[in-house]
């Protein structure tokens, strides 16, 4: 059995909302925070198109917090940014899962808005490389938890 977890989103209404989560994803927590910030509030179809553009290296993700030594990207008034392809692929899977959960509930997939998306640090996968004179060099891998809540917008 898997570990029990709770969503950080409060006031979940099962009639109008659907949710999904990705646990222990082997992606950068810092870049996941930046991508989630960019997707929050978007319509789900627009968010999926945006992630496709990031994966194809057509649109960069602006870096607001973790942007030390990052170059500016092309575009009018665009500051520091990157193309986090691995993060975009992982978050796209979670968004598609949320879309399928909404379809299963009978919600219209074209009217879904991302009202909550968050990235949290997961457990660290500890590893090490053997080095000279019997010393180990640690090589740890960060994991990330992603959670998404979508809501059907009434127009």
Swiss-Prot record:
Keywords: Ribonucleoprotein, Ribosomal protein, RNA-binding, rRNA-binding. The keyword Ribonucleoprotein applies. GO terms for biological process: cytoplasmic translation. CDD domains: Ribosomal_L22. Transmembrane segments: none annotated. It comes from the Archaea. One of its GO terms (cellular component) is cytosolic large ribosomal subunit. Signal peptide: none annotated. GO terms for molecular function: rRNA binding; structural constituent of ribosome. Gene3D superfamilies: Ribosomal protein L22/L17. The keyword RNA-binding applies. Belongs to the universal ribosomal protein uL22 family. This protein binds specifically to 23S rRNA. It makes multiple contacts with different domains of the 23S rRNA in the assembled 50S subunit and ribosome. The globular domain of the protein is located near the polypeptide exit tunnel on the outside of the subunit, while an extended beta-hairpin is found that lines the wall of the exit tunnel in the center of the 70S ribosome. Part of the 50S ribosomal subunit. This is Large ribosomal subunit protein uL22.
């Amino acid at each position: 059995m898997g570990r029990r977890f709770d969503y950080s989103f409060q006031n979940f209404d099962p009639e109008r909302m659907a949710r999904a989560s990705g646990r222990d994803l082997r992606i950068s927590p810092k870049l996941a925070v930046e991508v989630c910030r960019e997707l929050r509030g978007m319509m789900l179809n627009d968010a999926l198109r945006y992630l496709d553009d990031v994966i194809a290296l057509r649109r960069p993700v602006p870096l607001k917090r973790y942007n030390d030594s990052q170059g500016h990207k092309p575009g009018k008034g665009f500051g520091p940014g990157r193309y986090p392809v691995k993060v975009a692929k992982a978050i796209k899977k979670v968004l598609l899962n949320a879309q399928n959960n909404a379809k299963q509930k009978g919600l219209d997939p074209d009217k879904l808005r991302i009202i909550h998306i968050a990235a949290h640090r997961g457990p660290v996968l500890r590893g090490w490389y053997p080095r000279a004179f019997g010393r180990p060099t640690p090589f740890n891998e960060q994991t990330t938890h992603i959670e998404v809540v979508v809501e059907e917008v009434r127009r």
